[in-house]
Amino acid sequence: RRLRFFILLFAASSLLFHPPFDFEANATDAWYNDSWEYRKKITASLDTVISSDLTDFPYLVSFTDSDLTKTTESDGTDIVFTASDGTTELAYEIERFDQSTGEVIAWVKIPTVSASDNTDIYLYYKGTATSSSSSVWDSSYKLVWHLNQTSTGTVDEFTDVSDTGNDGTGGGTGDITQDADRRPTQVEAKIGYGQSFDGPTQSGGSEGSGDFIWSQDVSNWPGNNGSTSDNDTTIEFWAK
């Protein structure tokens, strides 16, 4: 069945969790690869944020550093993240990079984020062009929208970066008449770009009159089980 999503809040990303961290340019651990000239050590101190260790957690790295203007590639594709040993590459996704300012927004899948001790990772840059890993968001994520696109009503314009492929379209499509006036608007958000949704998005069980994003392929969502009947689905956003 096609399921219509009416999203009621301004969201900077499908998941926002931005723990405090410190970083340093000089470090003494082993080097990832001689093709990379620089690295920064990022230290997460989460003892006041989480009560137990997190496993395979997509950790948000977001900061601006003029040193990153030295990247080899203007889109940041020479950036690589490693574990605390300095050599084990971690799965990561670069959501946004601005070489002119050194701004980077990335999601790094850390095997264990400690609740009682510092967790260190490294960011390497000015090296060989590579590509982000798609394995940050595994099959347990049914949808991950960063909501950083400009909505034009193009089908599947809001890309689902998980393996599930539940892309979305601003203002409707399919069995919903496309309405340019009901597309969300791209804005500068807490983390990179986000979407502003105008007005109530549901009224009396109908579509209502507000902005929304529509997604068609939800047959593999929890509770659906291939049924032809509608099923309740909860979407949760974390924001800070």
Question: What do the predicted segments below correspond to?
Answer:
Residues F23-Q149, V161:
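Alpha-mannosidase-like glycoside hydrolase catalytic domains involved in N-glycan trimming
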Residues T43-I50, S219, F237-K240:
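Extracellular and analogous surface-interaction loops
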Residues T64, L147-T150, D232, W238-K240:
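Solvent-exposed strand-to-loop "edge" motifs in beta-rich extracellular domains
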Residues L147-R182, F197, F212:
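Short, tryptophan-glycine- and acidic/Ser/Thr-enriched carbohydrate-recognition patches
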